[in-house]
């Protein structure tokens, strides 16, 4: 014991017990993946899920997105009960679909319907990346095509918010067919004088970026959104060149003429309202059957 008085004891960092770590319930705090700042989740939600420190746009689910742009209580959903099957009998596909349905409380990776922005009627589709990474299968393509056709019938603008990893591999060619189907529906809408606004959010890639996401009369994007067809590494290996650091970001695409504007989430509803207001009357009122 006397020896202990003259020996410097090593100091160790105290590791909190499992019970102490559980004192902070899940979901109370949110860590920004960009600036690493830890904030109260309620502050992030209050700011439309935009980091108050660096402006990083956290992903929004479909319902959060609809609430942020439409007049309160105006949304009426289309085709809610449509669900994907497994036509190619892809192993474990049904289980993955069911898991995502329980996790997201959605039947598929897109929510479609109609609502108003400042009392102006629009048909809207919002992709939700929580469901199979927002991938486009036969039901996603069908719901979007039907929504476009509804906009055509109602003679109102169509708005889509994209967030997708591309075509859904478990549905093979049936998934790839949706690229053509949605594009044809949009062409019909456009030929009749219909307005189409595409808003690309993080990420918008693969077959979605190569089809309806890029066909808007106005192509908008959120800051920092990843937008592209093939992945960065695949392109670098193919062209044998190092790509710019900001390659495939919304800002890069805007600089190179592929977007009309990069719009902060705080300004999105007002930007859409202004576009809709500009297109009221005039040639927009002339529809061809």
UniProtKB/Swiss-Prot annotation:
Protein name: Acetyl-coenzyme A carboxylase carboxyl transferase subunit beta
Function: Component of the acetyl coenzyme A carboxylase (ACC) complex. Biotin carboxylase (BC) catalyzes the carboxylation of biotin on its carrier protein (BCCP) and then the CO(2) group is transferred by the transcarboxylase to acetyl-CoA to form malonyl-CoA.
PROSITE patterns: COA_CT_NTER (PS50980)
One term of GO molecular function: ATP binding
Highest taxon of the lineage: Bacteria
Keywords: ATP-binding, Cytoplasm, Fatty acid biosynthesis, Fatty acid metabolism, Lipid biosynthesis, Lipid metabolism, Metal-binding, Nucleotide-binding, Transferase, Zinc, Zinc-finger
BP terms from Gene Ontology: fatty acid biosynthetic process; malonyl-CoA biosynthetic process
Residues the record lists as binding Zn(2+): 32, 35, 51, 54
Subunit relationships: Acetyl-CoA carboxylase is a heterohexamer composed of biotin carboxyl carrier protein (AccB), biotin carboxylase (AccC) and two subunits each of ACCase subunit alpha (AccA) and ACCase subunit beta (AccD).
Chain intervals annotated as zinc finger (C4-type): 32-54
Enzyme Commission code: 2.1.3.15
Taxonomic lineage from the root: Bacteria, Bacillati, Bacillota, Bacilli, Bacillales
InterPro entries: AcCoA_carboxyl_beta, Acetyl_CoA_COase_Trfase_b_su, ClpP/crotonase-like_dom_sf, COA_CT_N, Znf-ACC
Family classification: Belongs to the AccD/PCCB family.
Pfam families according to UniProt: Carboxyl_trans (PF01039), Zn_ribbon_ACC (PF17848)
Associated pathway: Lipid metabolism; malonyl-CoA biosynthesis; malonyl-CoA from acetyl-CoA: step 1/1
An annotated GO cellular component: acetyl-CoA carboxylase complex
Cofactor entry: Zn(2+)
The record's free-text note on cofactor binding: Binds 1 zinc ion per subunit.
Cellular compartments annotated: Cytoplasm
Residues of the CoA carboxyltransferase N-terminal domain: 28-289
Catalyzed reaction equations: N(6)-carboxybiotinyl-L-lysyl-[protein] + acetyl-CoA = N(6)-biotinyl-L-lysyl-[protein] + malonyl-CoA
NCBIfam families reported for this sequence: accD
